[in-house]
């Protein structure tokens, strides 16, 4: 009976080992999944250094270059054409060199020149007339100002003469009156001084 027990113990020990190994193998992945990754310290992370961006000055050759402005044509701008009479010689055809281009019809050219000359002459004449009128107005104003000044001077002279005539006849009488008046004034002044120096005293009578 003893050998049977031993075999049973051996057989019972083997499956226990297998179950323990399987439990260990199952527990390993659980442990790895349950672990939390720790954040790395900031010192270990290397960032690229910031680069200095230097602004280009205005005197830089790139900024000094003149940019050509685009010139738009009449077709691109869609400008309306004005109703004007333009002779053939005025409009410059494309692809032609600079120079005078005369009109075939001399009569039309002469009419245009006559109209332009008449307008210019009229403007010049109007300017000349205006200038003459302004000169006449200025002369009239000057004459008025001179007449006013002369009238003022005459009035002043008349007033001066009247004052001089009044002073001349009163000069002889004024001398004698002046002496008498001066003596009277001196007496009055002396009497006023004495009255001030000697005040009025009250008199009391015992009865």
From Swiss-Prot:
GO terms for cellular component: nucleolus; preribosome, large subunit precursor. GO terms for biological process: intracellular mRNA localization; mRNA transport; ribosomal large subunit biogenesis. Its main location: nucleus. Residues 120-166 form a coiled coil. Residues 133-162, 169-178 have a biased composition (Basic and acidic residues). GO terms for molecular function: mRNA binding. It comes from the Eukaryota. Residues 195-207 have a biased composition (Basic residues). Residues 1-71, 133-207 are annotated as: Disordered. Residues 7-36 have a biased composition (Low complexity). It is found in: Nucleus, Nucleolus. InterPro entries: Loc1 (IPR037650). Transmembrane segments: none annotated. Keywords: Coiled coil, mRNA transport, Nucleus, Ribosome biogenesis, Transport. Belongs to the LOC1 family. Component of the 66S pre-ribosomal particle. Required for efficient assembly and nuclear export of the 60S ribosomal subunit. This is 60S ribosomal subunit assembly/export protein LOC1. It comes from Ajellomyces capsulatus (strain NAm1 / WU24). The lineage of its organism: Eukaryota, Fungi, Dikarya, Ascomycota, Pezizomycotina.
């Amino acid at each position: 009976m003893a050998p049977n027990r031993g075999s049973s113990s051996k057989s019972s020990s083997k499956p226990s080992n297998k179950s323990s190994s399987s439990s260990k193998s199952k527990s390993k992945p659980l442990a790895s999944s349950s672990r939390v990754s720790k954040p790395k310290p900031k010192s270990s992370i290397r960032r690229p250094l910031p680069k200095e961006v230097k602004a280009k000055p205005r005197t830089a050759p790139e900024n000094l270059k003149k940019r050509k402005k685009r010139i738009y044509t009449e077709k691109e701008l869609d400008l309306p054409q004005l109703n004007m009479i333009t002779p053939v010689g005025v409009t410059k055809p494309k692809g032609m060199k600079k120079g005078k281009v005369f009109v075939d019809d001399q009569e039309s050219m002469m009419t245009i020149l006559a109209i332009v000359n008449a307008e210019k002459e009229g403007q010049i004449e109007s300017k000349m007339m205006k200038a003459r009128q302004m000169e006449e107005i200025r002369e009239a104003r000057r004459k008025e100002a001179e007449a006013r000044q002369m009238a003022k001077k005459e009035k002043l002279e008349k007033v001066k003469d009247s004052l001089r005539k009044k002073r001349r006849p009163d000069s002889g009488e004024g001398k004698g009156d002046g002496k008498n008046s001066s003596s009277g004034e001196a007496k009055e002044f002396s009497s006023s001084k004495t009255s001030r120096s000697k005040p009025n005293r009250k008199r009391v009578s015992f009865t």
